[in-house]
Structures are given as structure tokens and as C-alpha cells.
Amino acid sequence: MPAKQRTPKVNRNPDLIRGVGKYSRSQMYHKRGLWAIKAKNGGVFPRHDAKSKVDAPVEKPPKFYPAEDVKKPLPNRRTAKPTKLRASITPGTVLIILAGRFKGKRVVFLKQLASGLLLVTGPFKINGVPLRRVNQAYVIGTSTKVDISGVTLDKFDDKYFGKVAEKKKKKTEGEFFEAEKEEKKEIPQVKKDDQKAVDAALIKAIEAVPELKTYLGARFSLKQGMKPHELVF
């Protein structure tokens, strides 16, 4: 590609000799159209005021940055979005737990908490599953349902299941070398009473349906030859 040729600037008032132009000052005044600019602004050339100078800072900024620069915290723009509940899971649906301590147990779904976890119970009196939170990824929804209209669930939220932080006691020299005995944590009486109240309302609805109590008490398991993808729950 050939290089672009530079076009030399043409002076509108070429010099006849050094310091003497071809056109006079008045001729260049008309040639450059300055008369039109003056007439447009009421017989006066437009003036552009100089920009105001910024006041000098009282203290000079440091010449060098510190070696350990403090990181600026980034703004948190995350918004809490509610977890979508599966269409097969509705209040009162009997679920099968697939993992954890109560794997294979059938439980009754009560409601979805703000964190997205499911509030379920056995009931405890039937199969030993207390009021607990379960992720919906680890349950199978069945077609069996229990009427939970008589169960009061207003007080149950994520804070209800939170653990109370305990202060660690400082050990003496003798206690440090002794084998630490694990103390059995006792369940608060309030939670025991809440479990009994929920169980009483659920068992009343369960006993109204024949063989539902036996169904909830039985543990789910796959036998040889059973294909889980072909089962209808």
C-alpha cells in the first residue's frame, strides 16, 4: 500500500518579500469573513473568558503510595432470590429422604422456609424423624398426601433451628492433659413440646387414613431387579 502524500499548507496571504504580505490587513479582514462574525455578535467579537483556576490543596498529596495498599471493599449487589419449589412437592406431601442420617425414611412436608430448605417431620412418634430442615435435592416427592390444615407452623423459621454459640472455657494445666469427656447435649424442653404438638395434630390426620401409619413407619429401599426410573412413587 503506497504511503499517503502530505499536502502542503497553503498560506492565504503569501509573502511577496520577507515580512510583506500580498494582501493588506483590511483585505484579509474581509477575506477571512471576520466582518460576518462581528456582525453576528452585535458588532463585537465574541470573547471567551479564561477558565477559573482550581485552588491549590492545603496539604500536598504524598509523593509515594504505601507499600501495603488497603483493598477497597467491593459493593455487594447480590439479591436474595427465593428458591423455586418443585411442582411435585406441596404442603402435606409424603417425601422419601435419600441421604443423611434418616436415609430411606418417609416424612411429611410441612412448608418451605425462607432459606429454600424444606421443613419436614416423621412424625417423630411414628418413625423417629423430628422436625428438621432438608434440601429438596435429596428428597423424592410421592403421590401420597396428608392433611396438615390442623398443624400450626407460624413459629418455625430458619432462626428456630440455629445453634446458640457457646463461649469456650479456659482450661487449667491439669484439665489440658486429661481426656476430654463429651457431654451429651440436651434438647430444650420448648422444642420437645413443639414436637409433641405437631405430632399430635399430624397423627390425628394420619390415623384417619387406613394403612398410612404403617406406610410412614416403613423404610424405603430398592430390592434386586427394581428399576428406580420406572417406579411410580
From Swiss-Prot:
GO BP terms: translation
Keywords: Ribonucleoprotein, Ribosomal protein
Biological source species: Arabidopsis thaliana
Protein name according to UniProt: Large ribosomal subunit protein eL6x
Record has Cell inner membrane as a keyword: no
Family per similarity comment: Belongs to the eukaryotic ribosomal protein eL6 family.
Cellular component terms per the entry's GO annotation: cytosolic large ribosomal subunit; mitochondrion; plasmodesma
Basic and acidic residues: bias regions: 48-72
Ribonucleoprotein among keywords: yes
GO molecular function, one term: structural constituent of ribosome
Gene designation: RPL6C
UniProt region (Disordered), positions on chain: 48-80
Signal peptide, first to last residue: none
